[in-house]
Amino acid sequence: MSSFEYRVTVHPAETFREIILFCSRDGACDAEAVPSGQIRKMESLLNEGGLQGWELVQASFGKEGILVFWKRQIP
């Protein structure tokens, strides 16, 4: 049976301001409104974790920032 370890990382809203705020107050969301630079920052974050063996479990977006939940198999 496989064993896993988990990690939670916190990323402040200033880092991903446009990603966090691309949904309006009435709930309308538009992925086209996210600047490409913000997408590249998110890709970089995910790729850095992946290179260390971490797999994304979930990313939770809020007004204060992003919580990213990771897991990786324990050898």
Question: What label would you give each PLM region?
Answer:
Residues 1-75:
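Terminus-proximal functional modules
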